[in-house]
């Protein structure tokens, strides 16, 4: 039985992970749950899974949870704060760490798990894209293992040779028969909109993804397609791929989650219904497979699978992220930071949808930082960029 730590248990990835545990109670035991401030959902999760530890980032939420658990005579120990999260991410007893905290908040806990030599199921792409070389060096310096659980990267992982699977980020793709990686994108809810019409879309419309059930932040990232740009960066790092070895195609049906083209002309693809439980369950059970609880794909009901190139004019954030990766680690850190600020402002109805890309571009182009060589330097760039971004948004509002 594998013992599991779930970082971000009340988010969409965390909920999907716990659903898989419910379906496979003889295979997994939850020992640590971590969330931000949703004490009500955390209480329900503690009641069902009886973890040894529950950690709330928010101190007030932790206090509420502790009282409610005591009232119900549940013995789960409650802690709060970032330090506790990082400590429990490295817990010796844990076999799998699900890294599903959204945004930069997931960086330090993920690195803590890596430095402890844990097996990490990575959904928090920000940890990788802002720390890049630092992240991969930490990974190679100990026994830690990474399994991607983004649907696209997991799809790529599934159809790569076993040797590449076991040596992510360390091997030459062409020497292992791989010609290219084809990264698919749904295009979000606005792929067939004209850019000028996007200024008027609401947060609710932008969060209404046609295929996937996701959290609010990643839903907006999908709508701007910056998420696919970040996934491009993630694929470059995880699979040691060059820019010429990755292609991006919009595939509105979200049935083919990505493909790998081999040097003999073969293309292997991973297909399933758009449900994150498929990717997560594979990573949890690799190299085996278990019941995910997802519905099965019915080919009799598939009428069309379409593919086309993304329009960089319509989705400038996609091109911005691709270009930022080529500029280096500092640029990726800046872009991630300003994007978290602009997405939050859009969700709060402070700026329009198109302002996300405009402000992201302005802040990235007007920022100049030396390449970070430590996590502390990454965090400093992140902090300064957030302050600058907030000032920019405030100047537009008032």
UniProtKB/Swiss-Prot annotation:
One of its GO terms (biological process) is isopentenyl diphosphate biosynthetic process, methylerythritol 4-phosphate pathway involved in terpenoid biosynthetic process. GO terms for molecular function: 1-deoxy-D-xylulose-5-phosphate reductoisomerase activity; manganese ion binding; NADPH binding. Keywords: Isoprene biosynthesis, Manganese, Metal-binding, NADP, Oxidoreductase. Its cofactor is Mg(2+); Mn(2+). Mn(2+) binds at residues 150, 152, 231. It is an enzyme of class 1 (oxidoreductase). Its EC number is 1.1.1.267. NADPH binds at residues 10-13, 37-38, 124, 126, 215. It catalyses: 2-C-methyl-D-erythritol 4-phosphate + NADP(+) = 1-deoxy-D-xylulose 5-phosphate + NADPH + H(+). Pathway: Isoprenoid biosynthesis; isopentenyl diphosphate biosynthesis via DXP pathway; isopentenyl diphosphate from 1-deoxy-D-xylulose 5-phosphate: step 1/6. 1-deoxy-D-xylulose 5-phosphate binds at residues 125, 151-152, 186, 209, 222, 227-228, 231. Homodimer. Catalyzes the NADPH-dependent rearrangement and reduction of 1-deoxy-D-xylulose-5-phosphate (DXP) to 2-C-methyl-D-erythritol 4-phosphate (MEP). Belongs to the DXR family. This is 1-deoxy-D-xylulose 5-phosphate reductoisomerase. It comes from Buchnera aphidicola subsp. Schizaphis graminum (strain Sg).
